[in-house]
Amino acid sequence: YAQIHYPFENLKEFDNRQIYPADFIAEGVDQTRGWFFTLHALGTMIFDSVAYKAVVSNGLVLDKNGNKMSKRLGNAVDPFSTIEKYGSDPLRWYMITNASPWDNIKFDIDGIEEVRRKFFGTLYNTYSFFALYANVDGFDYSDPDVEWSKRPEIDRWILSLLNSLVKDVDGYLEAYEPTRAGRAISDFVNDNLSNWYVRLNRRRFWGGGMTVSYTHLT
């Protein structure tokens, strides 16, 4: 309730059940008899309703050898220095794609660097490649979309894979499977987009006249 400042704000949306009960909540497995239960108990007593429709019970973050982190053992990782060094997005992506939320994760700093290099580095290089040649050719983002039948087969192939990816990721997220969603996105970027599409189309970009491809790459 505090997240939406109820009952001091958002009364109408809350009372009309637009934002309550919550679609899902996420906490550590240790909250099964704590927060998970307390929210339902309060919701039932006050509103005669469950407090949430689904729950994601998070596992524990262990060290890379599978041991519980502890200052005493010297295997704890400082999250603030880690974010400062590697960035928050690589850290998030590493944790999302490493293991399902309900499983324990063996945390390895080297894995964050690998994610930053392989996924984010590849994504950045792909965008930089597109931006370079789109600017050289004077591509206008306001140009109308190119008809499907006028697109080269390889362009239709990557678009088909992208549409399939969107459908699959939506399904994974609806089923509370963020790890499968993240891995599907990583595979698309690293394999299909970078290794196949960009590599096979380099000569087309170098030769100019790439309005068709620029349009769908945006």
Describe each model-derived feature in a short phrase:
Residues 141-143, 193:
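Short amphipathic helix-turn modules centered on a small-residue break
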Residues 209:
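Catalytic palm subdomain of template-directed nucleic-acid polymerases
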Residues 1-136, 158-201, 205-206:
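Structured secondary-structure scaffolds
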Residues 150-157:
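The feature captures the catalytic groove of carbohydrate-active enzymes
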Residues 215-218:
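Conserved small/polar residues in nucleotide/adenosyl-binding loops
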